[in-house]
């Protein structure tokens, strides 16, 4: 759950755009409505009844009466009336985190009154096209939005006894996705799903899942492996006030599932990103070497599923400046890193591989990483001005990456970004930072992926920077950068990773739980909601 400060942005709608489609009504004012169209499924499929939805947000205090009409493309059959009426608006409760274990959640109202319209539709054959949703009403200028239609081929209906076995895509690269373990029902330090629900396009293919469920973990392993991703870099948080004491940590359920509980754990790797910036890091070198590191060695590094490169466990230090501060300066930090290497060698490894986060382009932070004994540097994400176009975003990302590489101070692990958009947290939590919104759409994402691959292939053969790639981000549903399959983009981003970085044919069959007769996985979240109500 990282933080980034970006310029403020005005976000009209995440998915649909409002456009005048007829001459202005006598009111002659822009439509106040915000339209968010989405498919209920992350993977609509031919031969199956699917649902098209639109969430209509009404920022005014008026009780508007609307006619909402869906115009389908040829080949898509409507099973409900094309025009439906909206006259009732409501603001549902949102249960937002206080980031405080003793007083974890507070009840707030949704930002805008809203209503959702749903149509059942069907296509007999695979189909691509565009549907249009129009909204009109007395005193409201007509508004329209569109939604891509992409029905995958029909599958024979089956009920699988478990998550279907992954068919891993072959790749020569070590591809990892950064991973936030914040989606366990009722986790007091995390936002949870409630603030995300007003953004229905962000709903994952797995639904509002409970991350505590190992079956959810196995779906994530399947999705990752089948698109060339072979490890997750998982955020790891020490408990507040725990520095200097035997280790206690929070949100460790995902690491436990991947290493110990998932059925497919032997096929996948994980490593930890030490989030030492907002909760406790270490009190001093003694705490690092006698509390924290031994805990990691025994509980994580010695597990077969923990990522090692050249027999060195991989660890990310998110806030290197805090690490230096807590150890009493750069020289002390370097000495401690040397002792971490010695301890890992004594435990049977070849040392430890430490990577530190830095997303800027100035040389001084990279030089500090060198002086502290870091093995490499990477960017968690990229800070992009919200007013740049998607094409400019490609150039800005690559300019940032190339400047850090050309500095030549230490290996730079490339990061392939999705974007940024923490609007759910800004709207519904005590989010302390500013926010912007930018998105690398699939076409731009493909361009960046191809350029990063070219850059990696130009690096010394066998070097870390030629082998390792990080994706930003797997599941930051609240921060607004997420490559995992969801309603908004399906498998589009993962398929691009497979196309660019994997061997063999790009053709493959993606599955969602309903294809296998599995799920839903939201029982934990729904049960928790009842306790809040």
Question: Which stretches of residues belong to each language-model region?
Answer:
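Bacterial N-terminal signal peptides
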Residues: 7-17
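Low-complexity, acidic Ser/Thr/Pro/Gly-rich terminal tails and inter-domain linkers that flank the onset
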Residues: 24-46
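Short acidic, flexible loop segments centered on an aromatic residue
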Residues: 61-77, 82-88, 136
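Buried hydrophobic-core signal for structured, non-transmembrane domains
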Residues: 52-56, 119, 131-134
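Positively charged n-region of N-terminal signal peptides that target proteins for export
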Residues: 1-4
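Short tyrosine-centred short linear motifs in exposed loops/low-complexity segments
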Residues: 47, 62-64, 125-129
């Amino acid at each position: 759950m990282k933080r980034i400060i970006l310029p403020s942005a005005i976000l009209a709608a995440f998915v649909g755009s409002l456009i005048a489609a007829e001459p202005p009504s006598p009111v002659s004012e822009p439509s106040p409505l915000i339209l968010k169209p989405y498919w209920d499924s992350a993977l609509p499929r031919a031969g199956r009844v699917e649902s098209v939805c639109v969430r209509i947000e009404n920022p005014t205090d008026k009780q508007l009466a609307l006619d909402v009409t869906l115009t389908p493309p040829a080949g898509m059959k409507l099973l409900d009336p094309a025009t439906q009426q909206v006259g009732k608006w409501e603001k549902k409760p949102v249960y937002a985190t206080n980031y405080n274990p003793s007083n974890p959640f507070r009840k707030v109202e949704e930002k805008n009154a809203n209503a959702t319209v749903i149509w059942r539709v069907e296509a007999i054959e695979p189909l691509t096209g565009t549907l249009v949703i129009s909204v009109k009403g007395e005193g409201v200028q007509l508004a329209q939005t569109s939604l891509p239609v992409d029905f995958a081929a029909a599958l024979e209906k089956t009920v699988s006894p478990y998550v279907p076995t992954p068919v891993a895509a072959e790749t020569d690269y070590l591809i990892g996705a950064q991973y936030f373990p914040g989606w366990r029902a009722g986790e007091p330090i995390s936002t949870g799903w409630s603030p995300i629900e007003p953004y229905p396009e962000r709903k994952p293919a797995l639904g509002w899942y409970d991350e505590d469920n190992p079956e959810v973990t196995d779906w994530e392993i399947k999705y990752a492996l089948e698109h060339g991703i072979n490890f997750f870099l998982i955020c790891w948080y020490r408990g507040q006030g725990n520095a200097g004491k035997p280790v206690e940590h929070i949100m460790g359920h995902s690491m436990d599932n991947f290493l110990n509980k998932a059925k497919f754990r032997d096929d996948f790797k994980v490593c930890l990103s030490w989030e030492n910036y907002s909760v406790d890091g270490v009190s001093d070198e003694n705490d690092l070497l006698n509390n924290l590191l031994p805990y990691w060695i025994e509980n994580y590094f010695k597990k077969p599923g923990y990522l090692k490169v050249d027999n060195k466990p991989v660890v990310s230090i998110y806030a290197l400046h805090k690490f230096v501060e807590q150890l009493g300066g750069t020289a002390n930090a370097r000495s401690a890193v040397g002792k971490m290497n010695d301890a890992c060698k004594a435990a049977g490894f070849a040392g430890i591989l430490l990577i530190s986060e830095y997303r800027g382009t100035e040389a001084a932070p990279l030089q500090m990483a060198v002086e502290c004994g870091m093995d490499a540097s990477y960017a968690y994400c990229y800070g992009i001005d919200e007013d740049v176009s998607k094409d400019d975003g490609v150039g800005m990302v690559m300019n940032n990456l190339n400047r850090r590489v050309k500095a030549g101070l230490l290996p730079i692990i490339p990061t392939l970004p999705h974007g940024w958009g923490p609007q759910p947290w800004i709207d519904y939590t005590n989010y302390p930072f500013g926010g912007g919104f930018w998105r690398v759409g699939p076409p731009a994402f493909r361009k960046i992926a191809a350029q990063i691959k070219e850059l990696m292939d130009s690096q010394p053969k066998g070097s870390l920077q030629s082998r390792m790639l990080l994706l930003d981000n797997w599941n930051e549903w609240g921060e607004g950068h997420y490559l995992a399959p969801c309603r908004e983009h399906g498998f589009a981003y993962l398929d691009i990773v497979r196309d660019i970085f994997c061997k063999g044919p790009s053709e493959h069959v993606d599955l969602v739980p309903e294809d296998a007769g599995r799920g839903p996985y939201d029982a934990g979240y729904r049960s928790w909601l009842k306790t809040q109500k």
